[in-house]
UniProtKB/Swiss-Prot annotation:
UreD, UreF and UreG form a complex that acts as a GTP-hydrolysis-dependent molecular chaperone, activating the urease apoprotein by helping to assemble the nickel containing metallocenter of UreC. The UreE protein probably delivers the nickel. One of its GO terms (cellular component) is cytoplasm. The keyword Cytoplasm applies. This is Urease accessory protein UreD 1. One of its GO terms (molecular function) is nickel cation binding. The gene is ureD1.
Length: 280
């Protein structure tokens, strides 16, 4: 008989999640198609069948969530003329850490004449979770890009309240080798108190950043502002021949956030619209 108790478990190390997913897309025979696919560990990529339009890829973390010491890496590259919409099967969950941080690293590359939409569903942080998230984007001149990252601190409908957590979010976006957008966002360890500050979130527990880079991003400015309303903001910059549209949204919970984020994504993503998995 094997007896298990705290004494003989204390020396054991827990199995960690490690996942890597890599996808390359090419434009061939009038369609955007897979040119390379690599999957390792908990990272899986599935492509619903599409006859026309951009290639759609759904990213899956088969572990169901991340905690301290877990690692997840995504790498997406588009060759000349290709288009793709990348989303996730479900919200990513970051659970309480027993030590160390969970890490999510994403690298996106888009060649000339491509259109890339990075549209993962929300990342949910639970109490005492620790997350380091990194996004690196390389765009060639003439590439178009739409990026959405939404973060939720606890699920209000489930009675969850995040008091303590750590969250670091780092973005670097380059166009033609030049940095056109950079972010270093950090919260914690007293997240509950920090979110109450008027200069941070004013008591909101859900937030999103939307970034669009294309030649005509300015045409969406006024409509985007109308969708956002008072709880957020929208700005426009010229970056060389292209323009950059940046949107910030905040809301009391994920449901209220989605009520504005979904029509905004549908607007900015053109004919591709909102990913179907967002509505399931």
């Amino acid at each position: 008989m094997l007896i298990i108790n705290d004494n003989n478990l204390s020396g054991l190390s827990l199995q960690r999640v490690n996942g890597t997913g890599e996808l390359s897309v090419q434009f061939k025979d009038g369609r955007s198609r897979i040119s390379r696919l690599y999957q390792e560990g908990a990272a899986k990529i599935r492509m619903p069948q599409a006859v026309t339009g951009p290639l759609e890829a759904i990213l899956i973390n088969t572990s169901g969530g991340l905690t301290g010491g877990d690692r997840l890496k995504w790498d997406v590259a588009l060759d000349d003329g290709a288009s793709a919409v990348i989303t996730t099967q479900a919200c990513e969950r970051i659970y309480r850490s027993g030590g160390g941080e969970a890490r999510i690293a994403t690298r996106l590359k888009a060649a000339k004449g491509t259109r890339l939409a990075w549209l993962p569903q929300e990342t949910i942080l639970f109490n005492r979770s620790i997350l380091s998230r990194r996004l690196d984007v390389e765009l060639e001149e003439g590439a178009q890009m739409l990026v959405v990252e939404a973060t939720v601190f606890g699920r209000l409908a489930m009675g969850e309240r995040v008091v303590a957590a750590r969250f670091a979010d780092r973005w670097r976006v380059r166009l033609g080798g030049r940095v056109i957008h950079a972010e270093e966002f950090r919260l914690g360890p007293d997240v509950g108190a920090e979110l109450q500050a008027p200069a941070v979130a004013g008591g909101a527990c859900a937030m999103a950043t939307v970034l669009m880079v294309c030649e005509q991003a300015g045409r969406y400015l006024e409509t985007a502002r109308a969708i956002i309303g008072e709880e957020g903001g929208c700005s426009l910059w010229r970056v060389g021949k292209a323009s950059k549209l940046v949107v910030r949204l905040y809301a009391p919970d994920s449901y209220a956030l989605r009520r504005r984020l979904c029509p905004l994504v549908a607007l900015l993503n053109g004919k591709a619209g909102l990913p179907k998995v967002w509505t399931i």
